[in-house]
Amino acid sequence: MTLKQYTGTKFYNGAALVKIGAPWNAILSERAAGKSLYYVKECVIDYFNNKRLFAYVRRYDEDTKPKNVDKYFSDVNFTEWLRKGTGYDGIMCSQEGLYLYKIGDSGKQVKGDKIGYVFALNIAEKRYKSLHYDGVYNYIFEEFIGARYIENEFNVFNHLISTVSRRNPFRVFMIGNTIARDCPYLKEMGIDLFNVKPGKIYQHTLLQQNGNKILCAFDYVEPQEKKSLFFGKAEKTVVKGEWDVNEVPHLFFKLEDAELIYTCYFVSEELKNAYKIRVVFYEDNKYLYVYPYKYDDIEYVHNDIFTDTPDFKRKRFIHLEKKRHARIRDLWKSGRVLYSDNLCGTEFRRAMKKYNPFI
């Protein structure tokens, strides 16, 4: 039985990331780079070498239905590799378990060894709490970057791992495409997507309250030039790996030509992003001008909040007084919002979706 990992350069190669040995790993790239294939192989190899099972994790239970899971593991490059190295024909899902299988004489799948489990975060707190999952070491979390997240998702994911692995060691591979930079997972890992560049593996050490250190690794994969039939915005996001953004209104006048009425800030608890908002007056109209506002110590934020006095040293925010808050809401609802760029506008609008007064 021979199972070898991919060592070429045509597709994604995660050997450098795996070698670091971090328990928390995130991989971000353009679509169809081969990263999912690489880490599924990594988990299968670990099973055959060390008998360690893996967990396939998705955000929503729709993606963990057997037909969708079977489709995920049906990649021809994977099944040929598995068949050649082990004699098994693939991986199938049955009652939230993952099993190796062979095709029998009747043409049907014959279930073999259990190799892992499937989990969905949106049902995790109710479904998996009192159950036992022995032997799980690896976790593959697909599409961990999304346009929206479930409530307190990072904590839900941590609790799931705690339920499954208990106090045993584990290794997480979070796999994502370049959809949105406002990702709570990477923020919690100490990775700032505003200050990283493709083509490099970043490492960050987190310090727990008891003094223990946790190593996190982030592989921001360099986009590869490929021939494709996509064009326009799709070409930038699907082929070139650029961030998935929408067209938003930009500042159409010089900021110094407008009258500044006041400045405030918006801080998102879940996404851990901050924005500076200027209320300006230009040619008989008021506008909101929004642009990113970065500061280092943001983990203490406990609410989505508008504030005009962010006291970062004392870690305290003062809410906007009602009149100013109402003015911002009115300008938002009337569509008089301008942004520094499309990426800022896309991310700010996503943050606003969770802020009830603006929905």
Segments (PLM) and residue ranges:
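Phosphate/NTP-binding elements of NTP-utilizing enzymes
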Residues: 2-359
